[in-house]
Regions:
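Short beta-strand/turn micro-motifs composed of small residues
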Residues: 7, 62, 233-235
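Glycine-rich phosphate/pyrophosphate-binding beta-alpha loops
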Residues: 141, 145, 202-218, 286
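Gly/Ser/Thr-rich active-site loops/lids in small-molecule metabolic enzymes
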Residues: 156-166, 208-238
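ATP/NTP phosphate-donor binding region
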Residues: 1-58, 68, 304, 311
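Glycine-rich beta-strand-to-loop/alpha-helix junction loops that act as flexible
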Residues: 9, 61-63, 89-91
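ATP/nucleoside-binding phosphotransfer catalytic cores, i.e., glycine-rich phosphate-binding loops
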Residues: 189-190, 218-226, 233-312
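Short glycine/serine/threonine-rich phosphate/pyrophosphate-binding segments
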Residues: 43, 65-70, 96-97, 126
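Catalytic core of DAGKc-family lipid kinases
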Residues: 6, 16, 37, 75-200
Length: 312
């Protein structure tokens, strides 16, 4: 079995020594190549090359941004039988994708699950979302949520570490900086339904949307990797209402947090139109501003290697 490990050397949760241990362990099971990324887009290029060269498994070692790039590289030519399986060793700050799948968030435990999955030939085939020409594995957004991602990215370029505290600080600043009086987004569904009162959108391919520490946030709790896309379109931006909803979305009954929002699930697609270009993000990666994005669900897009965590 031929395998490629795509390593983000800037990943925060794994030391060089631990990466060497991972490579040694995988090398005992596969014909292994390990490559470190050098710049933005490099992970996608490496994954695309591996797909076209007939590699069996591509492992993303990094955070959700690295995983997203690898997925886009693997699916450069669309969904087909020759797409390598995806393995993930989480080494970012939040690691939403693996946690939503029920895989270990610890990189050493994740390596063990990956090896066991390869030995036992255990895979799960999951859907992906697509935003225009970009695949995403768990969520994309326009407006406030994307503005927070853009703000955090600006702070990281200044040398700040990506932490939950940083996200909270940027989130508060962006909330009070933004236009909370007039909605700027419009959502169009395939059946002709249109919402014209939306301040920001989260388009989800999985649940949860993200984590605050160990607490998951569930704006679209009925969305899964086995179905279509979920939509959370916020239509009220009052301070009290937002705080109430955010608190409920992390509780035992997240449906209570739907007040003030359009919440839909299992959508084949949708289009979001903005009155003017607004911040846009996919899988926590800040992209250029957009005034229109078309989303669609891509069923059974990719096989993920691993054994889910045992419960009980």
């Amino acid at each position: 079995m031929r395998a490629l490990v795509v390593v983000n050397p800037r990943a925060t949760a794994m030391s060089p020594r631990e990466r060497d241990v991972l490579a040694h362990a995988l090398g005992s099971e596969t014909d292994l190549e390990v490559v470190e990324t050098e710049n933005r887009g490099h992970a996608a290029a490496l994954a695309c090359r591996a797909m076209r060269n007939g590699t069996d498994v591509v492992v993303a070692l990094g955070g959700d941004g690295t995983v997203n790039e690898v997925i886009n590289g693997l699916l450069t030519d669309g969904v087909h039988d020759g797409v390598p399986a995806l393995g993930v060793v989480p080494a970012g700050s939040t690691n939403v994708f693996v946690r939503a799948l029920g895989l270990p968030n610890d990189p050493i435990e994740a390596t063990g699950a990956l090896l066991e999955g390869l030995r036992s030939d255990t895979y799960r085939t999951v859907s992906m979302g697509m935003a225009d020409d970009r695949y995403f594995c768990f969520a994309a957004g326009l407006g406030f949520d994307a503005a927070v991602v853009h703000g955090v990215e600006r702070q990281r370029r200044k040398g700040k570490r990506s932490t939950h505290v940083l996200y909270a600080r940027v989130g508060v600043a962006e909330f009070f900086r933004g236009n909370r009086r007039h909605p700027r987004l419009h959502v169009e569904l395939p059946d002709g339904t249109r919402f014209d009162d939306v301040y920001f959108t989260i388009v989800a391919n999985a649940d949860p949307w993200t984590f605050v520490g160990n607490r998951p946030l569930h704006p679209t709790p009925e969305t899964s990797f086995d179905d279509g896309l979920g939509l959370y379109g916020r239509r009220r931006m009052g301070v009290v209402g937002m705080l109430w909803s955010m608190a409920r979305l992390s509780g035992d009954n997240p449906r209570v947090g739907r007040r003030g929002a359009h919440v839909l699930h299992d959508l084949e697609g949708l289009t979001v139109i903005a009155d003017e270009p607004v911040p846009f993000q996919v899988d926590g990666d800040a992209l250029d501003t957009r005034d229109k994005v078309t989303f669609r669900s891509v069923p059974r897009a990719i096989r993920v290697v691993g054994v889910p965590l045992e419960t009980g």
